[in-house]
Amino acid sequence: MENNNEEFRTDILKGLSNPIQKSIPSKYLYDSKGSYLFEQITVQPEYYPTRTENSILEEYSTNILHNISKEIILIEMGSGSSKKTKHLFDSILKKQDKLYYFPIDISFNFLDSVVNDLETKNQNIRVKGIPNDYINGIKDCNNILFENNFKFDSFSRLIVFFGSSIGNFEIDEARDFLKAVRMNMNDKDFLLVGFDMIKDEFLMEHAYNDKAGFTAQFNLNILSRMNRELGCNFDLSEYIHSAFFNKKEDRIEMHLKSKSDQEFIISGCDRIFKISQGETIHTERSYKYSIEKIQELAIRSGFTLEEIFSDKNNWFNLVMLKPC
C-alpha cells in the first residue's frame, strides 16, 4: 500500500503542478467507491455506451467467436462487474465444456466480490481474478497458464477490452498500449475492443452529465480519495463537475471546476497549491472514433482488423483484432 500511495502521490504532484492545465490521471478515479459509482453510471438512461455495447454482445456473441477454432481462454481487461461478458460466457460454453476466465481490475475489493459471485453461479467457469493494471495483469495470466502446464499452441486467448476504455487513452498512448498488449499475444490469439463512435454532440455530452448526478459524484470522489490517502484538504463543496465535447480533439473531457480562489495541500509536500476561480482540474477524457481512425490505430499497433460488430445506429463498434 505504501508503494501504491507513493506512486499515487508522485502522479498527483506532477499533474497538479502543471502550469498550463492541472490534471489527475483517470486511473485514480477507480477506487472501490469510484468503481461502484461507475457501475451506477452505466445503468443511467443518458449513458448509452454500456447498453449499446451490451446489445451488440447479445446479438453477435456467437458470430464474434466464429473465427476462433481452438479452445478459448478469456481474459478481460478492466472487468468491472463482468455483466456484459455473460453473453460471451454463454456462447463460449456452447463451443467447449469449461472456460478459464481471468478478469483483470485495479480495484481488488470490487474484483474479489465479482469473482466470488461468478464462481458461485457458474460451475463450468474457472475464475482467477487478477488485481493488477492491464499489461501486468496479462503477464500474470500468461505466467499462471505456464505454471499450470497449459500448452500455448492448444488454445486461443481472447482478450477483451470493453466499455470504450480505449478512449481514455491519448491517441499515441492507445497505440503504445495496444502494442504492449500485442507483445503478450501470439498469432492464435484475438483482441476484442469496444470503440465509442463520433455522433451527435448533445447525445455524447448528455451521457456524461446524468440527471441523477452519479457522474458528478464519481468525478468528485477523486478529491475524497486524495483527502483520505494523501492527506489533502480539498473542500468538495467548492468544486463542480464539468463535462463537454472537445470538437478539435474528438473527445469528451471531464473536469472539476473551482468555484473560488482556493489553496490546498498534499501531506508531505512543503508547498501550498493554489487554484483560481473558474480554473479546472482535468480528470478524464474519452476519445470518440471513426472507422478510419480505428483502422489506422490497428495498423500502427501491429494488428489486422478482422471484423466489426455494430449496433443499428452505429453509435458503438466492437472490433475484433488479430496480431499480424
Q: Predicted regions: what is each one?
A:
Residues 205-287, 295-301:
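Substrate-binding/catalytic lobe of Class I Rossmann-like enzymes that use SAM or dcSAM, i.e.
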